[in-house]
Amino acid sequence: ISNITGISESRLDDIEAGKEGTLAEMRDIAISLSTSVNVIQGENFFPPQIAEWGIFIDKENRDTEISSFWGNIGILPVNSDKYQWFTITERAKLDIDVNINNKFMVVPCMNNKLLFLNMENIKRIVLLDEACGLPSQIDKNCVLDEGEIPLVVYEALSDYLFEKDEKKISKKLKKIIHNYMNVNKWLEEDIIDQINGITIFYNDGIVETDRLEMDNQDDILDLIFNAYIYGDDGYYDRAFSYTGEDQVQNRLLINQISMLQLPLIEIENNINDRYYEELYGLN
């Protein structure tokens, strides 16, 4: 890690022992481990997303398992003839197996994708591991991310655009993000969509896109939290709200939704802010 980040071993020892690292240092450590700052600080609400192949650390408690790329999930909403494809970790695949019969399911995916599924409005789910080949072999129109971008890149995108303080984002990480932007042909508008874009798949086949402007009163966070933690035992209203672009207040009926595609880091950070005491206890 020291060789990759340029942070001295003694400084890394201090951080590991509990001394506070700068945000830039934590981000550089996270990029060296192909994960997020939330993960290395133990404040990830969703399972770690490791942007590498062949990593699986099996622990006694499934909640603490760490895994990397497993394969791909294809989701076919009702009244649609187009699968939506996403890259998932082995831990995500195990959770899908456990929760597949729930009314609602939350699926953390790689490349900063988080899915909310209303299973009553999902026609079919396809799971393909490495041995099955690529989704394009069964879906010629497949559009798929490879899952190779560490979550810390998405955490730092806004600062990449606007922040000059090297205690928040290092030149090294800015260069890495710049390379990802070139490879993926991201423009500034694309970056904003990566940070807070939402795609809504309705059960009549209509698809809408928007940008989240998170408000602490938005109960989309409660919807995701309850579905992920409590499953069918959670309490759900008929509708949920979110604040969209230009501060537009949106109210959606859950039974009219097939799927929500959300930005994982944005949702995780806001869930942490709202539920911090419940999740991590008092400092």
Language-model segments: which ranges?
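Helix-turn-helix/homeodomain-like alpha-helical modules used for DNA recognition
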Residues: F46-K113
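Short C-terminal boundary/hinge segments that cap the last helix of small helical domains
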Residues: S34-A51
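Short alpha-helical "recognition helix" segments of helix-turn-helix
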Residues: I1-I4, I29
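Recognition helix of helix-turn-helix/homeodomain-like DNA-binding domains
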Residues: G6-G21, E43
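Surface-exposed beta-loop interaction hotspot
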Residues: V126-I192
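DNA major-groove recognition helix of helix-turn-helix/homeodomain DNA-binding modules
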Residues: L23-V39
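Short acidic, Gly/Pro-enriched loop/turn segments at secondary-structure junctions
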Residues: L127-C142, Q261-E278
